């Protein structure tokens, strides 16, 4: 029964991977949020089946589901700005060594490396 529903959903969401992610998100919302009035009619079905049916029927806004999914994946911590000037000076001192770090194009440390081709034989990439 769910397979037919998944095929019906392909008309609304053609990408199966996207369908799986969005249907999973909606099923979790059905499971955790109180929607007892709407689920009573479909009580014998599990949340994934209900989610697929509602997506296939167009009862669910795909854009809203995507936005809800994106919001759920965002970090919830907020970065507080530095208020104290002394703190910012301390942080500068901690990272002063970074100006000494440099990136070069010198790969001489790879000279003694052994490279193996797909046949398992040694080869020199410079030749």
UniProtKB/Swiss-Prot annotation:
Pfam families: RNA_pol_Rpb6. GO terms for cellular component: DNA-directed RNA polymerase complex. Keywords: DNA-directed RNA polymerase, Nucleotidyltransferase, Transcription, Transferase. One of its GO terms (biological process) is DNA-templated transcription. Transmembrane segments: none annotated. The keyword Acetylation does not apply. InterPro entries: DNA-dir_RNA_pol_omega (IPR003716), Pol_omega/Rpo6/RPB6 (IPR006110), RPB6/omega-like_sf (IPR036161). It catalyses: RNA(n) + a ribonucleoside 5'-triphosphate = RNA(n+1) + diphosphate. One of its GO terms (molecular function) is DNA-directed RNA polymerase activity. Its EC number is 2.7.7.6. Belongs to the RNA polymerase subunit omega family. Promotes RNA polymerase assembly. Latches the N- and C-terminal regions of the beta' subunit thereby facilitating its interaction with the beta and alpha subunits. The RNAP catalytic core consists of 2 alpha, 1 beta, 1 beta' and 1 omega subunit. When a sigma factor is associated with the core the holoenzyme is formed, which can initiate transcription. NCBIfam families: rpoZ. This is DNA-directed RNA polymerase subunit omega. The lineage of its organism: Bacteria, Pseudomonadati, Pseudomonadota, Alphaproteobacteria, Rickettsiales.
């Amino acid at each position: 029964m769910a397979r037919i529903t998944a095929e019906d959903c392909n008309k609304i969401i053609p990408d199966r991977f996207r369908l799986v992610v969005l249907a999973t998100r909606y099923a979790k919302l059905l499971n955790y949020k109180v929607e007892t009035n709407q689920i009573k009619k479909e009580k014998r079905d599990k949340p994934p089946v209900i989610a697929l049916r509602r997506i296939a029927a167009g009862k669910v806004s795909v854009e809203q589901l995507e936005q809800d999914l994106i919001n759920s994946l965002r970090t919830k911590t907020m970065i507080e700005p530095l208020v104290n000037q002394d703190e910012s000076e301390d942080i500068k001192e901690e990272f002063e060594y970074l100006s000494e770090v440099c990136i070069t194009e010198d790969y001489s440390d790879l000279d003694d490396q052994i490279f193996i081709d797909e046949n398992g034989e040694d080869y020199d990439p410079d030749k």
